[in-house]
């Protein structure tokens, strides 16, 4: 098994940190500190070395320390391709982030070729009651760990979708270019939808196989393209291309693309109660979310033979003793780098004795 883990992390002008240097190894790491000390900021900085906008989905200017024009995050990381230096640079008001691998610039969506991460934060606990966009992005992050090229597919699909919207909005009479764009969107949609469905198969199997103290969930996706695949559509790309062509006039008026894989919704049901997670109590929702994360982590290791970095922000808060102890025992058996935040060590003393403690 190949382990992904940080050897060191360096922050400059990052949120509340002027400068911070951490040395770590492939063990559990507990960040201890009062609320506001910067525990979640450290997890967020690590998450920037994975496709997307980090675990907070924050605006870039919000990441820079107040009154500073830039911030830098550097990491020496044991990656899928061996030991490597990664860095990300953010300049205030530039609305762009520069990511480097061994001092060579790479696209953000290329990070899934090098790293593998799973995270759980308190903000994610509202994912079942929020908009479909949040759930879809959550699912796609899971897919990245099984299909590293998925991040690039989603990024390119969104680029061509914005190009299509622009052409329609500006009434550019270039039917050939529009046809090419819609063809690319259709081809990428087919791959994106198939990746999602295959990942859901993996995840459902993992959930059903894993016996733990958390409720089991039934996972599905509500999307026209994905449903066509399930129904055995043989000419999927042609179907998508035709739908995009037929909705041009409608989309021109709407100012957006009304059909496609960007409209799909990730649905989660409480298996035993047979109700959608959004109708469960907040405690049940957190428990279901933890169950999904545990299943994802287990199956990523089983299928890819890669142990991801696991980022857990306040995971023990509001858990009963049985579930807390189960998690502690589960984490103790893992041979992977795990980052956990808490305000104190009460109730996790045994776990702390086997972890690297970092006090803020």
From Swiss-Prot:
InterPro entries: DNA-binding_RecF (IPR001238), DNA-binding_RecF_CS (IPR018078), P-loop_NTPase (IPR027417), RecF/RecN/SMC_N (IPR003395), RecF_2 (IPR042174)
Pfam families: SMC_N
Any one of the GO CC terms: cytoplasm
Gene Ontology BP terms: DNA replication; DNA synthesis involved in DNA repair; double-strand break repair; SOS response
Keyword Cell inner membrane: no
Positions that bind ATP: 33-40
Keywords: ATP-binding, Cytoplasm, DNA damage, DNA repair, DNA replication, DNA-binding, Nucleotide-binding, SOS response
Domain of life per record: Bacteria
Any one GO molecular function term: single-stranded DNA binding
Principal localisation: cytoplasm
Cell compartment(s), UniProt: Cytoplasm
Function comment: The RecF protein is involved in DNA metabolism; it is required for DNA replication and normal SOS inducibility. RecF binds preferentially to single-stranded, linear DNA. It also seems to bind ATP.
PANTHER family, per the entry: DNA REPLICATION AND REPAIR PROTEIN RECF (PTHR32182:SF0)
Family that this chain belongs to: Belongs to the RecF family.
Protein name: DNA replication and repair protein RecF
Species of origin: Rickettsia akari (strain Hartford)
């Amino acid at each position: 098994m190949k382990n992904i883990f940080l050897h060191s992390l360096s922050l400059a002008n990052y949120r509340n940190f002027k400068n911070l240097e951490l040395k770590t190894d492939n063990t559990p790491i507990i960040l201890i500190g009062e609320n506001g000390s910067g525990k979640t900021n450290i997890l967020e900085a690590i998450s920037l070395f994975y496709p997307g906008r980090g675990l907070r989905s924050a605006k870039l200017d919000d990441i820079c320390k107040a009154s500073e024009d830039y911030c830098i995050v550097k990491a020496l990381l044991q990656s899928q391709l061996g030991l490597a230096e990664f860095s990300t640079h953010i300049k205030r008001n530039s609305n762009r982030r520069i990511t480097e691998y061994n001092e060579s610039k790479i696209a953000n969506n290329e990070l899934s070729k090098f790293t593998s991460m799973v995270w759980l934060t308190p903000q994610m606990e509202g994912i079942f009651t929020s908009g479909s966009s949040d759930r879809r992005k959550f699912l796609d992050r899971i897919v990245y760990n099984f299909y590293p090229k998925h991040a690039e597919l989603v990024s390119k699909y969104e680029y061509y979708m914005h190009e299509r919207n622009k052409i329609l909005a500006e009434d550019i009479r270039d039917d050939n270019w529009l046809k090419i764009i819609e063809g690319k969107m259709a081809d990428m949609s087919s791959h994106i939808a198939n990746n999602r469905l295959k990942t859901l198969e993996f995840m459902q199997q993992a959930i059903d196989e894993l016996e733990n103290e958390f409720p089991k969930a039934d996972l599905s996706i509500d999307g026209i393209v994905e449903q066509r695949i399930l129904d055995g559509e043989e000419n999927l790309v042609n179907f998508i291309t035709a739908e995009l062509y037929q909705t041009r006039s409608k989309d021109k008026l709407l100012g957006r693309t009304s059909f496609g894989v960007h409209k799909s919704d990730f649905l989660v049901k409480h298996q035993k109660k047979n109700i959608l997670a959004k109708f469960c109590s907040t405690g049940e929702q957190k428990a279901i979310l933890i169950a999904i994360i545990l299943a994802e982590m287990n199956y990523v290791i089983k299928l890819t033979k890669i142990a991801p970095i696991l980022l857990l922000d306040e995971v023990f808060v509001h858990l009963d003793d049985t579930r807390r102890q189960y998690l502690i025992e589960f984490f103790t058996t893992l041979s992977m780098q795990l980052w956990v935040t808490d305000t104190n060590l009460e109730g996790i003393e045994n776990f702390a004795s086997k972890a690297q403690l970092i006090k803020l």
